[in-house]
Amino acid sequence: MQLIGMLDSPYVRRVAISLRLLVLPFELRQISLFREVERFRSFNPVLKAPTLICLDGQRLMDSSLILDYAQHLACGSRQLRPSGHAARATALSRSGLALALSEKAVQLVYERDLRPEEKRHAPWQQRVEGQLRAACGALDKAWLGPRPPLGEDSIGQDAIDTAVAWTFLHFALPGLIERRNYPTLEALAAEAEALSVFRDYPLA
């Protein structure tokens, strides 16, 4: 399989790390949607990252759909989400918050880097930033309390998504969110980023 996209995307990075943990062989092809548009288009004319090219040539888009397919391919040899109803709902809630955090951070980056200043709409930016801060607060609260140490044989999708989102936020929008205000997220991300699988797929 081939995974198309840059690791500076939280969506590409969460997929790459998860595929490795699921022991699914793949080739990462870091092709930029912005600097190599025509090259990316040759793999996916929709220009959406990540794109996964399956062994039979089918192309999958959307990181969550790709991971659903990947978990099916893994055939239960490694589960990134708990099977119990309550535990699974908790994990999905955390992942949802982490993905919302990523989405709002990406929106703010696009506003800053792609939209001309005279066309930016301040109320919209304030709304998105408010959503981002709400996601940070809710996600930090969702991880409060004791938890087992993170290891490559035990880390779940919710922790992967949380760490990837938190790291991306501070890489892409430095200084916007005070790290010290979210100590639970800061500690979890630091622990996850120390794992070799995270170091093998660095943000930059």
What does each model-identified segment do?
Residues 1-122:
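GST-like domain detector, emphasizing the conserved glutathione-binding G-site
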Residues 180-201:
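C-terminal end-helix/capping segment
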Residues 71-75, 110, 170, 174, ...:
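Hydrophobic/aromatic-lined pockets within catalytic cores
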Residues 67, 71, 92-95, 136, ...:
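Non-transmembrane alpha-helical segments in soluble domains
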Residues 98-187:
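GST-like fold's C-terminal all-alpha helical module
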Residues 83, 154, 200-204:
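Short, flexible loop/turn segments with low-complexity composition
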